[in-house]
């Protein structure tokens, strides 16, 4: 387990060079009005892992991968070396296994990361923090504070946090809350192809699980109705049992319903992002525009004093267009109308109705792009 140490007395740049300074890095950051870290909120298959890897490459950063992942409940230090990307994941080659940064927080005599609870893995979309949030806050604060004491900048890459983004922003106002945004057609297709080609149901089941566990929230119920989602005919008992029921359900789910469920979760997440994000990372544009990649780098440097390199981003839109013929068991013509319904709903809600706001315009662009890309999909 990590032991507290004295604050760093040297300032280290992104290249690992240090210079003596009587003040701690924490003090310098406060005086410059910069954020004390980054919470990188992303959905599954959004290219969030690639964005996170750009921060992990910096020597001044400690980059935590998915701090709400259920694997952390039972993780042992001996398990970490085997947790490398598979070639089917589409993740970038990593310089170290996924969960390496948690090693100091695992006690030798116990399984699991100190402070983690498996209940953290279920995202929530309630208007106010639930009863268990204070425990989650304490867990993340421990990771954050211990990292700062080591003289590093913490970057957390989440895949289960977008519903709780308002709660996390209230609890951690000192960090920059960045949201990775990808058009829903490409994001869905990435998970659908893994389901079709490799019998991996997780990414298709996840939206049904999130919607089912949150279906009593008024905003969730409304989005389910707008999208016409048919949830699994299973009672919501425990989180694990409902997750298993969802994975069984999607083994025979029709593509139309799977996309509707995914789009519903995307819409809910986008609403949170438009209202709460300090920075929106447009990964569709990132691979198309070197100017945008450079501007994003400068924006991060200005707020957090680190300079990630985004120049190697792939053109994910072109990639999706090239893979359109691989999409089977879903017809783009049958889901064409849902994008119009989604856009109308999003425009009607607070945070997306203001004229010309960056978040609102970007969300609209993503829905228009999704309609264009999905029109090429055919059932057979």
What are the functions of these language-model segments?
Residues 2-37, 227-380:
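PAPS-dependent sulfotransferases, especially Golgi type II membrane carbohydrate sulfotransferases
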Residues 33-46, 55:
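Walker A (P-loop) phosphate-binding motif
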Residues 41-43, 155-159, 180-182, 282-285:
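Short His-Asn-centered micro-motif
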Residues 48-61:
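A conserved segment at the C-terminal end of the G1
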Residues 50, 164-171, 272:
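A short acidic, amphipathic alpha-helical/loop segment
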Residues 66-155, 224, 230:
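PAPS-dependent sulfation machinery
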Residues 111, 115-123, 204-256:
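Extended, charge-rich helix/loop segments that form flexible
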Residues 157-158, 171-192:
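Conserved phosphate-donor/acceptor-positioning beta-strand/loop module used by diverse small-molecule
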């Amino acid at each position: 387990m990590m032991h507290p140490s004295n604050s760093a007395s040297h300032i280290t740049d992104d290249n690992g060079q240090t210079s003596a300074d009587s003040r701690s890095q924490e003090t310098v950051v406060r005086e410059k009005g910069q954020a004390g870290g980054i919470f990188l909120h992303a959905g599954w298959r959004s290219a969030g892992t690639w964005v996170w890897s750009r921060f992990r490459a910096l020597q001044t950063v400690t980059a935590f991968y998915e701090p709400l992942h259920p694997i952390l409940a039972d993780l042992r230090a001996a398990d970490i070396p085997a947790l490398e990307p598979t070639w089917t994941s589409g993740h970038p080659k990593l310089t170290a296994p996924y969960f390496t940064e948690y090693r100091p927080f695992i006690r030798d005599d116990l399984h699991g990361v100190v402070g983690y609870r498996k209940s953290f893995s279920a995202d929530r979309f309630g208007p106010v923090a639930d009863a268990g949030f204070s425990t989650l806050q304490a867990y993340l604060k421990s990771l954050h504070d211990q990292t700062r004491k080591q003289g590093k900048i913490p970057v957390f890459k989440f895949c289960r946090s977008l519903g709780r983004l308002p709660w996390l922003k209230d609890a951690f106002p000192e960090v920059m809350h960045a949201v990775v945004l990808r058009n829903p057609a490409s994001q869905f297709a990435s998970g659908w192809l893994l389901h079709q080609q490799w019998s991996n149901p997780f990414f298709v089941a996840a939206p049904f699980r999130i919607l089912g566990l949150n279906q009593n929230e008024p905003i969730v119920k409304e989005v389910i109705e707008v999208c016409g989602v048919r949830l699994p005919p299973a009672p919501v008992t425990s989180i694990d049992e409902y997750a298993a029921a969802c994975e069984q359900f999607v083994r025979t789910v029709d593509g139309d319903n799977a996309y509707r469920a995914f789009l519903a979760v995307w819409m809910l997440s986008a609403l949170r992002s438009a209202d709460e994000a300090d920075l929106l990372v447009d990964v569709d544009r990132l691979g198309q525009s070197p100017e945008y990649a450079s501007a994003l780098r400068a924006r991060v440097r200005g707020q957090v004093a680190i300079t990630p390199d985004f120049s190697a981003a792939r053109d994910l839109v072109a990639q999706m267009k090239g893979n359109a013929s691989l999409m089977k068991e879903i017809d783009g013509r049958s889901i064409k109308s849902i994008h119009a319904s989604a856009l109308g709903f999003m425009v009607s809600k607070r945070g997306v109705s203001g004229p010309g706001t960056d978040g609102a315009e970007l969300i609209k662009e993503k829905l228009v792009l999704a309609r264009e890309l999905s029109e090429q999909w055919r059932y057979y």
